Amino acid sequence: MSSNIKSNSVIENSWAQLKQLTSARIALGRSGISLPTHAQLKFQLDHAQARDAVYFQLNVSKLCADLTQSFSSMNLESIGLQSDAIDRPTYLKRPDYGKRLSQISKEILLKRITKAKFSPNTFNYDIAFVIVDGLSALAIETNALRFLKTACTNLQSEKFTIAPFCVVEQGRVAIGDEIGELLSAKLVIVLIGERPGLSSPDSMGIYLTWHPKVGLTDESRNCISNIRNGGLSDTEATMKLRYLVTQAHKREISGIALKDETSSKQSLSSLNSFLIE
């Protein structure tokens, strides 16, 4: 009798079959006039995981060590940096602080550049990768190293010169502009933890900017978002990244002037969804 009561207590939504196609919170059904208990508990869990992702602290020294070891064959080093936001509460309350390097970090970067003895008034690198914790350090810890292995291997055939990896704590997207300008890189590629969603606390985004410099705004950048298990795969993201990087160098543009013309229709058709004809 108790099993009958349990099975009849939740009224299923007619869209329930669509739940297999998305992790979004749809077709939850109802129990009386409320959500089913399992749906309410799942919401609370997802909300807690999203909050935890915001306050998750990136282990910068470990990531730098892992990057240096993984890319030793390419002779790429890693540099740990800090934004002007001294802690997480400051970072959340003052977004502008996350857009600029702290004075100490700026000096560290300048010393590295001086040591390299680059020629003045020339570009030192074709590409500068900047890895930033953003609003989800969990996303960077989960995805950044794995993705960079795929991306750098794919880009290696293009013979681009790559700057030392810069790993930034308490940073925003725009901090890549300052770093790219200091390194005198033609193109900066920022990997950053995106704002956690209720179904994706570990989503990583990528922002590309041609001729980075302090003061640029969003229309100057291209974005590839939702890179994670269950989102955009490393292979698909790398395909998009390679196209944008090669086109940016060829045409010397980025942002709204540069469109991603990789075949999204082909990628979507591989999902075998009846919603995509």
PLM feature segments, named:
Residues S2-E107, S267-L271:
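Active-site loop/lid in soluble adenylation, ligation, and acyl-transfer enzymes
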Residues S83-D84, V132-G134, V168-Q170, L191-R195, ...:
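Fold-independent oxyanion-binding glycine-rich loops
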Residues I86-R88, A137, G197, G215:
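Short, acidic Gly/Pro/Ser/Thr-rich loop/turn segments
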Residues E194-E277:
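C-terminal functional extensions of proteins
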Residues F71-L76, T122, P201, T217:
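A generic structural signal for short, non-catalytic loop/turn and secondary-structure boundary residues
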